[in-house]
């Protein structure tokens, strides 16, 4: 705690410096995925992508509590795991939608390919409440042949008062084309 006039001055100065030098949390962009997870990526296969699918992943960036009188905001980390030991997984779309079903953000400008057993993530900070209480992701994927189904999950972290919460939402397949 800061006591006295001098203590308040130093406390205020420290908080101002902290505000200047600590980066603001922002939602991750498509370029951020490619740069942050460069070691998880490989070149897009030249063969025909004969197997494809899509996952729907609920993502609770906000949750109503106390009969709707209180709202708890959560950070969301979407993790997309290539569960194949042998084939790359091509991600064609990672889209974030709000409660009304309107697309908030598309995280890929172009398809990317994950190495076998690799993972990429998308982070939505607690301060980004554009998704609301019914936010969700849709992840479109493809592969050159039979492949282990990707594992797609969202981890929500947040708190309200002295309580802290963490929970996971698993993606559900909503589309499959080709033999898998």
PLM regions and their residue ranges:
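Bacterial N-terminal signal peptides
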Residues: 10-21
């Amino acid at each position: 705690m800061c006591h006295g006039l001098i203590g308040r001055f130093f406390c205020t100065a420290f908080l101002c410096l902290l505000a200047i030098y600590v980066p603001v949390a922002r939602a991750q962009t498509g370029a951020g995925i490619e740069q942050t997870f460069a070691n998880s990526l490989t070149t897009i296969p030249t063969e025909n992508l004969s197997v494809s699918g899509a996952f729907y992943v609920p993502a609770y960036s906000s949750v109503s509590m106390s009969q709707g009188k209180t709202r708890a905001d959560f950070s969301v980390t979407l993790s997309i795991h290539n569960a194949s030991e042998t084939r790359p997984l091509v991600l064609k779309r990672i889209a974030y939608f709000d409660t009304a079903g309107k697309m908030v953000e598309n995280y890929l400008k172009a398809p990317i390919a994950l190495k076998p057993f690799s993972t990429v993530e998308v982070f939505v900070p607690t301060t980004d409440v554009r998704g609301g209480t019914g936010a969700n992701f849709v992840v479109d994927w493809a592969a050159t042949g039979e492949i282990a189904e990707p594992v797609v999950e969202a981890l929500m972290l947040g708190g309200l008062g002295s309580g802290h919460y963490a929970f996971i939402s698993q993606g559900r397949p909503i589309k499959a084309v080709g033999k898998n």
